[in-house]
A protein has these predicted regions:
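Phosphate-binding/switch loop-helix module in NTP-utilizing enzymes
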Residues: 131-181
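Nucleotide donor/acceptor-binding cores
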Residues: 56-57, 86
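Post-Walker A helix-loop "phosphate-sensing" segment adjacent to the P-loop in P-loop NTPases
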Residues: 78-89
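Walker A/P-loop
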Residues: 70-73
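Conserved NTP phosphate-binding and transfer environment spanning the P-loop NTPase/kinase superfamily
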Residues: 2-16, 21, 27, 37, ...
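Conserved nucleotide-sensing/catalytic segment adjacent to the nucleotide-binding pocket
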Residues: 28-32, 89-92, 96-153
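N-terminal pre-Walker A segment at the start of P-loop NTPase domains
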Residues: 25-51
Length: 309
């Protein structure tokens, strides 16, 4: 019989190696053994039991900026592959951002704020829907998926895109707004930050984003079989984590070609205001519909887990 302690012994080396690759000299990952034993491995047992009846099994992972979605989803991928022997494909909703050229066109047609990547409406929803459809096809054929380079705020060239060669058992689809739902139109009237107050005076931007969630994104998210929500304590904490994240990106991209695309502290805080409305709406409602909720402390650590279905 498979046990969680047995699985820990089999995956710990690879998981710890990955965690180490994400650390910096000043920032070390805390409580990694507890995270694996108490939370991520048990969740993989839960996921694998559900995935047996449906191929592919669409696993959504959502959390605000800097909650560790990429790190935690990568560890889940390692465990599901190494211990459960499942074919897993992981991709971020960030990889589906529209190109700079497409967002520029959108910003001129609808609202200038849509030049800034992030909110629903700035992703290529048709490619995402096509990705889900092709992944489910019984006559599966290999296909390519976009890869986004945040350092240049645009897609990588096609020869650097992902290739899905075989139909996966599990697809991990992670991102800050994965599974997000639209809010009531009445709540859109009140601005929640200085950006909305000064740059979206006619509510055009927030209504557009909300309508995207209500229609196209709902069609996509309704296809998720499970949603894991990484719940932070506050939006101000997310801002702090996002600044750390940007510093890491800067360290990785010191070349002259990309340096001017890395954001300053002021840029990050301004940038995050575009995320605030959807993120705060998820604080209120995602715990009601997520399948698994990981409550995080101020150090990114999972302090508790709730399994709902």
């Amino acid at each position: 019989m498979n046990t969680e302690s047995e699985s820990f012994d089999k995956v710990k080396t690879e998981c710890f190696r990955f965690i180490k690759s994400q650390e910096t000299s000043k920032e070390k990952f805390k409580g990694k053994e507890k995270m694996l034993k108490s939370f991520l491995i048990p969740s993989c047992f839960w996921i694998s039991s559900k995935a047996k009846s449906k191929h592919p099994f669409f696993l959504g992972i959502v959390g605000g900026q800097g909650t560790g979605k990429t790190t935690k989803s990568s560890i889940l991928e390692i465990i599901l592959k190494k211990y459960f022997k499942l074919n897993v494909f992981k991709i971020s909703i960030d990889d589906f951002y529209k190109t700079r050229k497409e967002r520029l066109k959108l910003s001129k047609k609808i609202h200038p704020l849509l030049m800034t990547r992030g909110v629903p409406g700035t992703h290529d929803i048709n490619i995402m829907l096509d990705f889900f459809k092709k992944s489910k096809s019984r006559k599966f054929k290999p296909f390519k998926l976009p890869k986004f380079n945040k350092a240049i705020d645009d897609r990588f060239k096609k020869n650097q895109w992902y290739t899905l060669k075989k139909r996966p058992d599990v697809i991990i689809f992670e991102g800050w707004c994965v599974g997000a739902k639209a809010e009531k139109n009445s709540t859109l009237k009140k601005s929640i930050n200085s950006m909305e107050k000064s740059k979206d005076t006619k509510l055009i931007w927030r209504k557009y984003v909300n309508n995207e969630l209500k229609s196209k994104y709902k069609k996509l998210y309704d296809q998720l079989d499970c949603l894991i929500y990484l719940k932070a304590q506050s939006f101000s904490l997310l801002q702090k984590w996002r600044l750390i994240q940007e510093k890491k990106l800067w360290l990785k991209n010191k070349s002259k070609k990309t340096k001017n695309k890395i954001m300053t502290k002021e840029d990050v805080l301004s940038f995050m205001q575009t995320y605030q409305r959807v993120t705060q709406n998820m604080f209120k409602f995602a715990p009601k519909y997520a399948s698994i909720i990981f409550n995080l402390n101020s150090d990114h650590q999972i302090k508790s887990a709730i399994y709902k279905k």
